[in-house]
Amino acid sequence: MRKAERARKTNETDIKLSFHIDGEGKADIQTDVPFMTHMLDLFTKHGQFDLSIEAKGDVEIDDHHTTEDIGICLGQALLEALGDKQGIKRYGSSMVPMDEALAQVAIDLSNRPHLEFRAEFPSRKIGTFDTELVHEFLWKFALEARMNLHVIVHYGTNTHHMIEAIFKALGRALDEAALIDPRVKGIPSTKGML
């Protein structure tokens, strides 16, 4: 069973997270950052993962610490759940439209953490959520999961739609990359290791 749990308690946040790669798209996400909760629901549903999160943070300051620490915990849980990565497809990509917006995500579960982020959002905020935190979340997620993550928003005029397309594409691309392919024997690399 490819599943992992993480807990992180600091002076800024208190997070408990459970992530199951081979799930059914079930989300039980409770955070004090409503927009992030919504995006993680979409990620879970479209990736067919099971994800449970209880997160509290110092949102009276802003949403930064909570959003960042969720990315850290989710990345660590993904890395553990993948195990030795034997038999996985390793690569995944998805292009998702959301009304006028189009986002593309490509992933390599390579143990070479990198984020390439090409998105310019028309609005700096959605409600109280700072849109720059999308980059912060994705960078911490990629770093802790040790994955190469490329995110491009090709176009869009509605910031909510653009970010929603990113999280749906992220779920779909990760589902593909983490999939066990019976044709893959051992580690999916000519080096023999990732």
Curated annotation (Swiss-Prot):
<comment type="similarity">
    <text>Belongs to the imidazoleglycerol-phosphate dehydratase family.</text>
</comment>
<dbReference type="GO" id="GO:0000105">
    <property type="term" value="P:L-histidine biosynthetic process"/>
</dbReference>
<keyword id="KW-0456">Lyase</keyword>
<dbReference type="InterPro" id="IPR000807">
    <property type="entry name" value="ImidazoleglycerolP_deHydtase"/>
</dbReference>
<keyword id="KW-0963">Cytoplasm</keyword>
<dbReference type="GO" id="GO:0005737">
    <property type="term" value="C:cytoplasm"/>
</dbReference>
<dbReference type="InterPro" id="IPR020568">
    <property type="entry name" value="Ribosomal_Su5_D2-typ_SF"/>
</dbReference>
<protein>
    <recommendedName>
        <fullName>Imidazoleglycerol-phosphate dehydratase</fullName>
        <ecNumber>4.2.1.19</ecNumber>
    </recommendedName>
</protein>
<dbReference type="GO" id="GO:0004424">
    <property type="term" value="F:imidazoleglycerol-phosphate dehydratase activity"/>
</dbReference>
<dbReference type="Pfam" id="PF00475">
    <property type="entry name" value="IGPD"/>
</dbReference>
<keyword id="KW-0368">Histidine biosynthesis</keyword>
<dbReference type="InterPro" id="IPR038494">
    <property type="entry name" value="IGPD_sf"/>
</dbReference>
<comment type="pathway">
    <text>Amino-acid biosynthesis; L-histidine biosynthesis; L-histidine from 5-phospho-alpha-D-ribose 1-diphosphate: step 6/9.</text>
</comment>
<dbReference type="InterPro" id="IPR020565">
    <property type="entry name" value="ImidazoleglycerP_deHydtase_CS"/>
</dbReference>
<keyword id="KW-0028">Amino-acid biosynthesis</keyword>
